[in-house]
């Protein structure tokens, strides 16, 4: 290969989507990665790969990550694991069923390389427990929730009708647009703190207390409009891994379209005059148009240029704690699902956290770990990194206590306490603990053997006066910090300028040949990624009109003829048409089938009498007021 139009460095999700988009439009692309695997900053890694990754981060080989620490208990004989059985995402995300990325997966046919599973359980931590579970996505759910008073149900219904059906929506919101959402919900709808927390932090996945009304409502509508697109759930996760799996899917699509791939390859030099790029294997190539570079794989000769590009950009830090536990955590999941969301709102932890702690939980049925285990992906955008780590550890301890309390078969004995047994076992436990820690694998940022995140907090007596004696068995614990220039509210993605977004920054002495990409955002969903990619695409081609503007219909017909679905046993059943352990053949066909089977009126009817609804449900809370099953809210516009 003597020349190419575009050289892309890094196989992260943004770069992989870009490679596919360019290739399908006839652009000749060379796509390289310094790693031996795909995904870059979005990789899905095994435990052994994570050990090496931590070393590379702390040695400066991998940029934009820091403070990488891994702890693998080795004393207990039960902690025997097979590294390749784990797929741990560096930047885990969930996908709303109404989203640009999912639409692109369908349009580009990349979904054929992936499997999806439904996600419907969103939990909010409140009053030292996970008593509130966000599943009130139909009128029946709201009215049959015995934890809510009739008046609260009425206020909640008024708000949800307003959010999705009120023709005067914009006019009513306008005076509150920049006011904290809590004020709007309290003054206009008389909602109380528990309901506000669920709406803002779980359904809306807002990260801060002072989220504006305009932004919070858009986030809530995102959840509600995604419900019932493919089934009775708002979100999905990809099986066997998140963004890393999607990256590979788009790379495969790009390869089909003509992109050339080279892993374990670094850019060592580039002459902007001759446009010749040199690589670590001694090869070279002429670049006709642009070089796109992921910040994690920044060549040494461009370090000073990169520093100048970002010197006036606001950095944001995302602190993450990933814990693999020997519990499947089914207590927090619905039916045959294998994932759940847990959110700790601001000020809900003993550490008085200033920002939300958000947790994605996935168990063995998602393909990311063995059966009977689960991975907890927790994160926070707290900018005080010391405090962020303390918040994450506190959230872990709360989850641990709650899970053990819910699943314990000896709660009564633990509450009463067996002092004699405790006293007799103390010495033995201490000796066992000492022996168990002898073989622990520990790596921290300094290369020493200090345990990771050693802070602990005593749990209060408010946890139903029960603190389990046992601890969760941990397979692996990983902590690290990611640096990004994307605002957590995604404002500089949806409203980018040359002063707030790295993609639009010119690189000095590069003749406008080099573009740096953004690191992944702190956003828990995939929102903003397609917009970000389109920004790069436009800088290369001058327009986004032809972005994936390809007719895939003929290819789809041929694929369907040659790949008839094979019925085979699945570990779990299909939930709402999305995988619960098996595969799907056509998301579009699935949506059409779901719409045909769900043709009755919307769950919220604008002309219904609300008092009659409440009275009917009060008479018989086990049935819907019209004798129908639960139905979803309808989709609405996503912008004010």
UniProtKB/Swiss-Prot annotation:
Q: Where is this region: Disordered?
A: 414-439, 594-640
> What are this entry's molecular-function GO terms?
GDP-dissociation inhibitor activity; GTPase activator activity; Rab geranylgeranyltransferase activity; small GTPase binding
The residue ranges flagged as biased composition, category Acidic residues, are: 604-624
Keywords from the UniProt entry: GTPase activation
One Pfam family named in its UniProt record: GDI
Instruction: List GO BP terms, alphabetically.
Output: endoplasmic reticulum to Golgi vesicle-mediated transport; protein targeting to membrane; small GTPase-mediated signal transduction
**Which SUPFAM superfamilies does the record match to this protein?**
FAD-linked reductases, C-terminal domain (SSF54373), FAD/NAD(P)-binding domain (SSF51905)
Q: Where is the composition biased (Low complexity)?
A: 419-439
GO terms for cellular component: cytosol; membrane; nucleus; Rab-protein geranylgeranyltransferase complex
The source's superkingdom equals Eukaryota
Q: What does this protein do?
A: Substrate-binding subunit (component A) of the Rab geranylgeranyltransferase (GGTase) complex. Binds unprenylated Rab proteins and presents the substrate peptide to the catalytic component B. The component A is thought to be regenerated by transferring its prenylated Rab back to the donor membrane.
**UniProt record similarity statement:** Belongs to the Rab GDI family.
This chain belongs to which protein, by name?
A: Rab proteins geranylgeranyltransferase component A
Naturally occurring in which organism (per UniProt): Candida albicans
